[in-house]
Amino acid sequence: MILDQLVQASQQRVQKVPVRERVKRIQQARKMTTPVLSFEAMLAQPGLQLIGEVKRASPSKGLIAAEFDYLQIAQDYVAAGIDAISVLTEPRYFKGQLSYLQAITQTVSVPTLRKDFIVAASQIASARIAGASAVLLIVAILTPVQLQAFITLAHELNLSALVEVHTTAESKQAVAAGARIIGINNRNLKDFSVNFATSCQLRQAVPAECYVVAESGIQTATQAQQLAAAGFDAMLVGETLMRAPDKGQAVMQLRAGVRG
């Protein structure tokens, strides 16, 4: 299973860092007073917000961008009016780096999200140190105790937690753990298949007090309009934008008829 491999690789990377260094990283993040752009304030804006992803590769699609000027991509997104940027930092399967997140965060004027397979508190701390506004937490790879602890830590570090779910049961688990932002992933992480209908099917299971983000498989303005009509606060779009030669045009096409 692809997900098991991703989690195992993430755990191995964490374990390569000495425990003392991991503790020091968390302590450093706790002491930081540098303000970050608010991810939740972005989601609170009227209309359907667009989160553009910076992603070089994926397990299902292989190499997406042979030429990968990640800073230019981020700047193109911002110039096109993107509302936030998601940065893949997973190195083995997505060819990402934490340094990409840090450089992009220092360059752009919109909130950034660390997208990775987070399995340890030190990874959340590293996101804060890199300047991110939010971290992705995946319900499917965390125990209820871990999920609650990681959401709490993120909030203590002034980070938002985008808590990703794929089923109604996971959505309930996320809410019980204290999630304020729910990301509904149309992609099944067990086999990486995509079903766009998942978003709208699960939307009604998310309480009104939570922000809700649709993830994966979003390619057209019609889909964006469906998400807006269903009451989503944002959509996270990766491959569609990454493959577009004119990212500004791609952003405009996705937003056609959608206020955001």
UniProtKB/Swiss-Prot annotation:
Its EC number is 4.1.1.48. SUPFAM superfamilies: Ribulose-phoshate binding barrel. GO terms for molecular function: indole-3-glycerol-phosphate synthase activity; phosphoribosylanthranilate isomerase activity. It catalyses: 1-(2-carboxyphenylamino)-1-deoxy-D-ribulose 5-phosphate + H(+) = (1S,2R)-1-C-(indol-3-yl)glycerol 3-phosphate + CO2 + H2O. Pathway: Amino-acid biosynthesis; L-tryptophan biosynthesis; L-tryptophan from chorismate: step 4/5. It comes from the Bacteria. GO terms for biological process: L-tryptophan biosynthetic process. Keywords: Amino-acid biosynthesis, Aromatic amino acid biosynthesis, Decarboxylase, Lyase, Tryptophan biosynthesis. InterPro entries: Aldolase_TIM, Indole-3-glycerol_P_synth, Indole-3-glycerol_P_synth_dom, Indole-3-GlycerolPSynthase_CS, RibuloseP-bd_barrel. Belongs to the TrpC family. NCBIfam families: PRK00278.2-4 (NF001377). This is Indole-3-glycerol phosphate synthase. It comes from Lactiplantibacillus plantarum (strain ATCC BAA-793 / NCIMB 8826 / WCFS1).
